[in-house]
Amino acid sequence: MKKNKISKSWVIRQRRDKYVRQSKLEGYRSRAVYKLKELDEKFKIIKNNLSILDIGSAPGSWTQYLSEKSKGSKIMSIDLKDVEKIEDVYHVVGDFLDNKKQKIIKDYFPKKIDLVVSDMAVNTTGNKNLDSIQTGELSLTCLLYTSPSPRD
């Protein structure tokens, strides 16, 4: 019974959310795109002809925006889930920390990656402390992976 109430309240909230409606009107896969748009408008991070890696890309709205905004760029997205194809984007299904997936990333970007974006989130458990710890670990792991090593 409780799950059903949560589902109903989620549906109601989704219907009222202006960003959900706007994302549908603009053809984006999720409302999350507006976080990236806001960052880009403020910091001008997305330019043309970049090498871009989107980690944790499903459902793909950030990747859509990157593909539209960054003309001539080489873009790879990676996620545990498959996503609907986005033109001129190479999507990899799997864990970005897996050695085989890291090799795929390095082979695709033999020189350097200009921009790494990530909107990853853990599957929440309902335990706020555990969810917070897991989210922090995920963010730290992504940061450490993308940070240059001393030899770079």
Where are these regions (language model features)?
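Conserved class I S-adenosyl-L-methionine
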Residues: 49-58
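Short SAM/SAH-binding signature in class I
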Residues: 113-122
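Conserved SAM-binding motif I beta-strand of class I
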Residues: 74-78
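Conserved small/polar residues in nucleotide/adenosyl-binding loops
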Residues: 145-152
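S-adenosyl-L-methionine
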Residues: 81-112
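Glycine-rich S-adenosyl-L-methionine
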Residues: 130-144
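Conserved SAM-binding loop of SAM-dependent methyltransferases across substrates and taxa
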Residues: 59-70
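Class I SAM-dependent methyltransferase Rossmann-like catalytic core
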Residues: 2-47
